[in-house]
């Protein structure tokens, strides 16, 4: 990898505290741009500082144009542009380049993203399935209950350790994006589901003794290793198929449903922002749009004037 990209990655890790997932996206986007420069602008394979110095805004615009022609989604293009902005801003601040070519490139408008959500009835269909009573069935129930009860991200769920659970207070310590910690409440059904799982989980009885030296993952696979995000998605997919719900449902759908149902019940945006671990309130505001859309749908179905009645 190019040395300056490596430096930028270290900066994002140590000084900006960005998550591994975000840094991986940055590196992927920057390496894609690097390959584009090599193939289309005869920039040397081993990019040096001088080569980055020669990148101008026309090259960046041509790269974005190539993405548009390949019909890459606008939201993905916007993310790639954000990666380039962060990288060239870093190079400019560190005086690796004299001019920042991204200052002349405007950000494209993206479609307003409104997340998919499940209704409360659909959530109950999923959570009331007959889960197996072995340790893995108990684990799977605990995972689904915890997702809907707390609204955490899949990366946060897989990162939970046994010592992060405070059953007496009904709280979990969560390590979120940018390695930031927050405390999240969970409801009684989720708390009980996790405790039933832990009672059958191998080695869980002695986990308290191991806390000081080595964190004990809460959710584990058959080899007692920490469950991966991909495995969690597969587990959810299995139960969605069993439920008969004809929808694409991911772990993030449960997070969106959690937030939207709180909004529907009258929770304020600031509280939802804190629960979800959003840095910006504008990120949380998309749930307002979901709630308004749902409200309008109910109005259209129920109000006589909406149906053209007299």
UniProtKB/Swiss-Prot annotation:
GO terms for cellular component: cytoplasm. Its main location: cytoplasm. SUPFAM superfamilies: DNA breaking-rejoining enzymes, lambda integrase-like, N-terminal domain. The active site is at residues 153, 177, 252, 255, 278, 287. Residues 1-92 form the Core-binding (CB) domain. The keyword Cell cycle applies. GO terms for biological process: cell division; chromosome segregation; DNA transposition. GO terms for molecular function: DNA binding; tyrosine-based site-specific recombinase activity. Keywords: Cell cycle, Cell division, Chromosome partition, Cytoplasm, DNA integration, DNA recombination, DNA-binding. Residues 113-300 form the Tyr recombinase domain. CDD domains: INT_XerDC_C (cd00798). It is found in: Cytoplasm. It comes from the Bacteria. Site-specific tyrosine recombinase, which acts by catalyzing the cutting and rejoining of the recombining DNA molecules. The XerC-XerD complex is essential to convert dimers of the bacterial chromosome into monomers to permit their segregation at cell division. It also contributes to the segregational stability of plasmids. Belongs to the 'phage' integrase family. XerC subfamily. Forms a cyclic heterotetrameric complex composed of two molecules of XerC and two molecules of XerD. This is Tyrosine recombinase XerC. It comes from Syntrophus aciditrophicus (strain SB). The lineage of its organism: Bacteria, Pseudomonadati, Thermodesulfobacteriota, Syntrophia, Syntrophales.
């Amino acid at each position: 990898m190019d040395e300056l990209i490596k430096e930028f990655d270290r900066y994002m890790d140590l000084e900006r505290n960005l998550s591994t997932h975000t840094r991986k996206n940055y590196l992927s986007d920057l390496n894609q741009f690097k390959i584009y420069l090599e193939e289309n602008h005869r920039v040397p394979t081993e990019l040096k500082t001088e080569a980055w110095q020669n990148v101008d805004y026309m090259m960046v615009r041509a790269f974005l144009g190539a993405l548009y022609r390949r019909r890459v989604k606008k939201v993905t293009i916007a993310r790639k542009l954000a990666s380039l902005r962060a990288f060239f801003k870093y190079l400019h601040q560190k005086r690796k380049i004299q001019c920042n070519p991204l200052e002349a490139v405007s950000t494209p408008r993206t479609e307003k993203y409104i997340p998919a959500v499940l209704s409360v009835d659909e959530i109950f269909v999923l959570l009331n399935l007959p889960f197996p009573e072995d340790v893995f069935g108990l684990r799977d129930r605990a995972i689904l209950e915890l997702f809907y009860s707390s609204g955490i991200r899949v990366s946060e769920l897989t990162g939970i350790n046994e010592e992060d659970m405070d059953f007496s207070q009904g709280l979990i310590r969560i390590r979120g994006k940018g390695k930031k910690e927050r405390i999240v409440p969970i409801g009684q059904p989720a708390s009980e589901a996790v405790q039933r799982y832990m009672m059958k989980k191998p080695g869980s009885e002695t986990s308290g003794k191991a806390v000081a030296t080595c964190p004990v993952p809460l959710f584990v696979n058959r080899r007692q290793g920490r469950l991966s995000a991909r495995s969690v998605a597969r587990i959810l997919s299995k139960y969605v198929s069993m439920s008969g719900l004809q929808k694409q449902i991911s772990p993030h759908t449960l997070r969106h449903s959690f937030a939207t149902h709180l909004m529907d019940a009258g929770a304020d945006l600031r509280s939802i922002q804190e629960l979800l671990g959003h840095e910006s309130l504008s990120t949380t505001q998309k749930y307002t749009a979901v709630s308004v859309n749902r409200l309008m749908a109910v109005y259209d179905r129920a109000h006589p004037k909406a149906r053209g009645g007299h």
